[in-house]
Amino acid sequence: MSSMKWLSATAVFAAVLPSVSGFCFPEPKELNFSRVGTSSSTTFTETVGEAGAEYIVSGNASFTKFTNIPTTDTTTPTNSNSSSSNGETASVSEDSDSTTTTPDPKGGGAFYNAHSGVLSFMTRSGTEGSLTLSEIKITGEGGAIFSQGELLFTDLTGLTIQNNLSQLSGGAIFGESTISLSGITKATFSSNSAEVPAPVKKPTEPKAQTASETSGSSSSSGNDSVSSPSSSRAEPAAANLQSHFICATATPAAQTDTETSTPSHKPGSGGAIYAKGDLTIADSQEVLFSINKATKDGGAIFAEKDVSFENITSLKVQTNGAEEKGGAIYAKGDLSIQSSKQSLFNSNYSKQGGGALYVEGDINFQDLEEIRIKYNKAGTFETKKITLPKAQASAGNADAWASSSPQSGSGATTVSNSGDSSSGSDSDTSETVPATAKGGGLYTDKNLSITNITGIIEIANNKATDVGGGAYVKGTLTCENSHRLQFLKNSSDKQGGGIYGEDNITLSNLTGKTLFQENTAKEEGGGLFIKGTDKALTMTGLDSFCLINNTSEKHGGGAFVTKEISQTYTSDVETIPGITPVHGETVITGNKSTGGNGGGVCTKRLALSNLQSISISGNSAAENGGGAHTCPDSFPTADTAEQPAAASAATSTPESAPVVSTALSTPSSSTVSSLTLLAASSQASPATSNKETQDPNADTDLLIDYVVDTTISKNTAKKGGGIYAKKAKMSRIDQLNISENSATEIGGGICCKESLELDALVSLSVTENLVGKEGGGLHAKTVNISNLKSGFSFSNNKANSSSTGVATTASAPAAAAASLQAAAAAVPSSPATPTYSGVVGGAIYGEKVTFSQCSGTCQFSGNQAIDNNPSQSSLNVQGGAIYAKTSLSIGSSDAGTSYIFSGNSVSTGKSQTTGQIAGGAIYSPTVTLNCPATFSNNTASMATPKTSSEDGSSGNSIKDTIGGAIAGTAITLSGVSRFSGNTADLGAAIGTLANANTPSATSGSQNSITEKITLENGSFIFERNQANKRGAIYSPSVSIKGNNITFNQNTSTHDGSAIYFTKDATIESLGSVLFTGNNVTATQASSATSGQNTNTANYGAAIFGDPGTTQSSQTDAILTLLASSGNITFSNNSLQNNQGDTPASKFCSIAGYVKLSLQAAKGKTISFFDCVHTSTKKIGSTQNVYETLDINKEENSNPYTGTIVFSSELHENKSYIPQNAILHNGTLVLKEKTELHVVSFEQKEGSKLIMKPGAVLSNQNIANGALVINGLTIDLSSMGTPQAGEIFSPPELRIVATTSSASGGSGVSSSIPTNPKRISAAAPSGSAATTPTMSENKVFLTGDLTLIDPNGNFYQNPMLGSDLDVPLIKLPTNTSDVQVYDLTLSGDLFPQKGYMGTWTLDSNPQTGKLQARWTFDTYRRWVYIPRDNHFYANSILGSQNSMIVVKQGLINNMLNNARFDDIAYNNFWVSGVGTFLAQQGTPLSEEFSYYSRGTSVAIDAKPRQDFILGAAFSKMVGKTKAIKKMHNYFHKGSEYSYQASVYGGKFLYFLLNKQHGWALPFLIQGVVSYGHIKHDTTTLYPSIHERNKGDWEDLGWLADLRISMDLKEPSKDSSKRITVYGELEYSSIRQKQFTEIDYDPRHFDDCAYRNLSLPVGCAVEGAIMNCNILMYNKLALAYMPSIYRNNPVCKYRVLSSNEAGQVICGVPTRTSARAEYSTQLYLGPFWTLYGNYTIDVGMYTLSQMTSCGARMIF
């Protein structure tokens, strides 16, 4: 069958057109009229000659209402407006009944230019001109204008082209060359159409015809085949038009040049404009393209080359449509919009792609204010698209362009019976090519470039039935230096709801929000999609990149980019030197992936750096990575994901029909290759990544670096609620917040298949994340958190099985695993469902978790792992805060770092579980903490049984909860750790369990980890922890070695409230170790433990050892207490119950099947204020069967000589240790009423056994054993409870007969629990009297029997005031059980005070006691200590010195010679005074020193110029220090001195020769002072812990008279004065009597010291004048003999003994020397500064005195 082709017809003009010379340019033609095609005329169409035409438009010119479209007279009614045309004629067929008028398809109804000349329209300068072309409908190309040459529109005021139609192309304008519009004020192209009429369906299929046959039959075949589309839209039909464009036949006689072959363009394209050359619209104000349409491509514009819009104020392209591509514009070349203000592409549509723009070349948006592409559509949206059989296709539908499926093979707008294409289609009719419908807003086959947009680039509300709802870019997309790039509310039926790209997308230097919001895609990439494994989205210098509320039905709700998404900021300028600036934000929020991975973004690498903030929040994914999916190993392949969907759609719903047509119809070769290459490149991506540049983070698929604020919150997914990655690194972030994310399986916040690294963060917060199985906050194979500057917070994260149903574990039923596999099958790339560890890691899950070098407060609080699943399976619930499958390491070298674990929990809603509930805060097989840490109120719990039948104690498979704070296998803690308020069944604070993840030793691959808890090199506090069964610490092996260790107020139901162990435990103190206030709550054990009988009594033990069945039946658990650098103390550890237990069973420190060893270093103590009540599994009646209790045994050449104390000071202490005790070194102290029961006891030489009154040392009834005492010390600091005839309760050495039924193996069932060990040294052979035999029930007593009275209380007992026999030791009543030899009494036998007497030892024990004879001598109240008494007497010299210093100030300052030269004024003086006196020791006195300081105030007047009179008041505060000859006491004394003085001076002359007038000048100065001095002294006696206090007063007088004679007086030329003087100085100090208080007081009588001195000396004085300031200086030297003095003698009496004596004061020698210096500085007429210094030097004394102050004259 030959194909039919519609051939173009040539219009024949009736009149000959005037010829235009080709050798000259045409004259411009005025265009100032309007034409309306209303009558027969030949002048409607302007025909252009060969040279072209230039039209000068003035006024309003218009061409309207013309058509050459034929109509059928018999079938088509004519319109009243279409009966004639303006000035044109036509040749019409005469047979109106059967013939249809058919024109040649000629174009250019208004202007026709068939030549290459230029056709231009313009206005003259300064005039206005508008051109309107409307309602012109033509069968040919260019409804209004056809131009073979260049077409120009220049400087028109208005250009309106509307309602025009072409039945070929170019509904308004068709240009064979370039088309240019410039300088247009307003250009409007509206309602123009390029519509190819639909062919008429033939009743019968015609045979193939030749060209001539076709010509001959065309008249009969054309009538039924033409149906005007315009008539269906109520446009004029013009059936009877008379025009030269209409001929009688449909087929021309000959073809033109353009018709000899298939046209290069597509008929039905370019609804308004069709340009074969470039189309340029520039320098215009308003340009509007609206409601234009085309049945092929380019609803408004079709250009075979470039399209350019430049410098346009307002460009609006809206409501245009195309049946195929380019709803507004189709450009085969490039499209450029530049230097314009407003550009709008709105509500355009196409059915096959490019709803607004379809460009085969590049698109360039540059230098624009704003450009908006909105509400455009690509595809068919009116009806569901289905593929129909060709026999059913309708060919006569007038609306075929709107309803035909784009999936049809022709690609055109009509479908014929035979499937043939319309004329001009270049598609092969033998192939069916599917419609693409790509790019709802724009489509480009090459690149899209956006530059320098200052307002906004908005691509919004566009739709596409294929990919790229907003835009389709096959090449690169580059956007730079622009403002507000936004893709809003676009949608796609496939990938890329906002934008679909097949090459790299680069965004740089964008301001405002770069926004992808509310875009949707039915496949991948709701907001953005990039095809290809090597294409990336790269962003640099963006203010804000936002993916908000985008949705995809497969992967990448916000964006799908296979290779990489990166955003960073770079700057060449450093705002602050050395600091790289940050700028911009990333916002990924509210995006959804309803059927796949990556709710926010899905990419193989996400790199964000140098940004101000990042927010990934509110995103969701049906599979993995709610916020971001970056894992390359499980990365989904977009095309691979399409194929199963397409295949299934072929047999499913009608909605899938378009996809079926695309996938199963004959595809283009490019489609096939893209599928193949994408799958191949996806598989090859790991190898490619290895060849990348050597970036240290190259293998990191998620990188967030150098960001101020990062938030990942409220995202949801199956895995990785916030982020799903392979390797993730977040570094150098000021604030990182991961909160309120959720995942149904693993990784609520972040999930990484391999590693997660958080480094150099200032603040980290991971809060309120939720997961169904593992890792509420973080989940990774390796988690490394390091170098955090201000700590972090993990709070209220939760792993809760109830959120997902059943978590798969090794013990989970197969049905649960099958359901999970079925869910995973929704994504083909999903791996097989893994076996999960259970509900683990409320905050963090990892195989290896490491925290290092973090500073500040690092907090885990309120995190939970919960199994609330009602299924029958029992899950492991472990690690409320952290679960590390292999190891956890936490370390910090910063002393300010503190890790806090508070309120974390693991729990199950079941009362019985076979799953292991462990680690309220931490679970890991290997735990290493080397940092300060606090664990408080963490819990591991099960639901309370409702009935007794639900109690898991009866079933061996039911497991107890372990480790309220920490659970693991090998746990090591160092630093400072505090555990408080934690709760679990076993190990309320720390518990161990066998590691299920480690292969057993039998596997041969590796050895299992040994269960052990190690606390070392730090301080550890355990307080108020609660164990529902046993132990704040629970482990087979425990090693504690720390500075300060405290177990306080921990509780447990059974023994072992502090520590429960089954193999060995070592506690070594480097500081203080304290077990206090730990409580056991149950009287009887409710169930049997290994090696125990049912209902065994609890003792309230803080430490409990039970080897169970883990060791041989005869082996006890080993406990070693080692006080190496600190003390170990057990006190108030108790059994508290309401059953009225006796005190003997209320307090206990250690119990269980324990082999005990005690070692204390020198000066250190192990104190048991609670009893030790251990048992043993050894059985036998001889002592050598039992273990040895080594006390202070030397180890590794380290001697242990400390003290072991058993005390009943707080409550009764009866300790039972079934071992052979050997005291190797040091001291064992049994305090008052304390009992120690051992199998045997041996005291080695050099050790010390101290027993207080009432103490008992005994063997046990389970075996024969001796008590060998080699030196016993009895502490008499207390009396005990003496019986009649006893001064104190003597200690007892007790022997107990062995019972035949004794069995150590019975443990606590025996009345005396046991745990003995064999003595290491067997009894040597030799004399029975001197060689003890350890297997005998006998007491061996030898060596020194030492009595000590450390407090001196014993000898104050009045019973010692007479002679008597004193029992010292209680012994067995059977003398055969006692052997005493070589015993010597020693110690405190001669007291320093109290009842004095002598002791005589009776070494033969009688009637069960050893006693001594006391003979009374005398009684002494005070301990004697030699004292000297010089201190009190020597204080007199200090009092005298305090008065002399005041006198010296008055003489040298107030009464200075210079003052007598002054004018008579009144003076006020203020002085500061000080003195220091030191005296060496003399034969009569000890050394002492005195210093004092004070103030003096004086006022004086000069009644005459030669006379001064004044008064002064002074106060001194001093201290006296004595350097004693005997150093067993010292004095602390103080002194307060108050003095009042009167002084005066007179200057006179002594007449030597009256006749000659010779006279000597004399100066008389005098001072009288009275002083009252108070003393307060305390004397301390450290050696005897005593003191004295003494308070007394001194009264003093001092009188001084100085007479000076001038040898040289000042003259007019000199101020120098030389003086000799003599002085009389008298002082008297009287010390009042006083009595000491406190220790052995004494009474001292009065004593007095009087001294009269006669200083004689000379002085030199003079003035210095400088800068109007006068300084007057004086220097004096004197010899100072004492002409009278007494030696003060003080008598005293000791009150206790009436002993009397006297003290002679060590006074200075009689001769001494004195030097004085004084100065006065005159600052003016009213102010003077002054000062003086005096030094007295004697043989044994040195006294220095000074004063300085100011004088005011008034």
From Swiss-Prot:
Signal sequence, start to end: 1-14
An example Gene Ontology CC term for this record: cell outer membrane
Membrane-protein topology: Peripheral membrane protein
Compositionally biased residues, Low complexity: 68-105, 212-232, 413-427, 636-668, 1299-1311, 1320-1332
GO biological process, one term: double-strand break repair via homologous recombination
Region (Disordered): 68-109, 190-235, 252-271, 397-438, 621-668, 1299-1332
Protein name (record): Probable outer membrane protein PmpB
Organism for this UniProt entry: Chlamydia trachomatis serovar D (strain ATCC VR-885 / DSM 19411 / UW-3/Cx)
Gene name linked to the record: pmpB
